[in-house]
């Protein structure tokens, strides 16, 4: 059981690390009246239809009554932060003369994104960095139509980049220095090109 609100990538990483499956309750990028259950297999990727079909086929089954077992409350963040150190060159990010503006969209990434950058002394500005079950009356979806405030902030701040994620932080959006939305597919292509070179 997680000690805190938890982004999907943090739980997925720990599932793989601990060779365990995980269950998460999340509305993801949907409106606040929604809530779903996300099953994360031990390989940390999306569950295949073969796996989810088995789960669905057992929804109506009766569970035997028994004594409650002890539940361990766990902090999944430290292992994830250590893993990120092997992937991200925080020093290079710190050396950039770019203003980072992060829109938390009232999501599960609040407390994680700011911790990651703060510990590494990377300055950033932020929007919507408090938990709100109604997502401030908006949608926790990092698409341009829901990022108008972030887009305006980037346009009005010289040499800046805008970043946002959805409710459980497994989808992202990027706003370039001109206030233009850069899709996740474009970002992945840019990263692949960079890694190849």
PLM regions with names:
Residues 35-157:
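Gly/Ser/Thr-enriched, mixed-charge loops and adjacent short helices
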Residues 1-34, 116-175:
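N-terminal small/polar loop signature for handling phosphorylated ligands or for N-terminal nucleophile
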Residues 7, 105, 180:
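Glycine-/small-residue-rich active-site loops that bind phosphorylated ligands and cofactors
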Residues 11-15, 113, 191-195:
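Buried hydrophobic packing segments
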Residues 3, 104, 184:
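Small/polar loops that bind or transfer phosphate-bearing groups
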Residues 6, 108, 190:
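Short alpha-helical
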Residues 7, 75, 79, 183-184:
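Secondary-structure junction/capping motif
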């Amino acid at each position: 059981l997680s000690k805190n609100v938890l982004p999907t990538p943090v739980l997925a990483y720990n599932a793989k690390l601990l060779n365990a499956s995980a269950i998460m309750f999340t509305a993801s990028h949907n409106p606040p009246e929604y809530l779903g259950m996300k099953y994360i297999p031990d390989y940390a990727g999306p569950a295949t239809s073969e796996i989810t079909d088995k789960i669905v086929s057992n929804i109506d089954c009766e569970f035997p009554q028994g004594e409650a077992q002890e539940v361990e409350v766990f902090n999944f963040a430290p292992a994830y932060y250590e893993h990120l150190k092997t992937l991200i060159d925080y020093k290079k990010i710190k050396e950039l003369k770019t203003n980072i503006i992060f829109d938390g969209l009232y999501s599960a990434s609040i407390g994680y994104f700011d911790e990651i950058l703060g510990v590494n002394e990377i300055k950033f500005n932020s929007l919507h960095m408090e938990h709100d079950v109604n997502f401030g009356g908006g949608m926790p979806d990092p698409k341009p139509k829901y990022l108008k405030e972030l887009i305006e902030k980037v346009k009005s701040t010289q040499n800046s980049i805008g970043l946002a994620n959805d409710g459980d932080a497994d989808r992202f959006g990027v706003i370039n220095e001109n206030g233009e939305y850069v899709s996740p597919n474009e970002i992945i292509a840019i990263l692949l090109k960079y890694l190849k070179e």
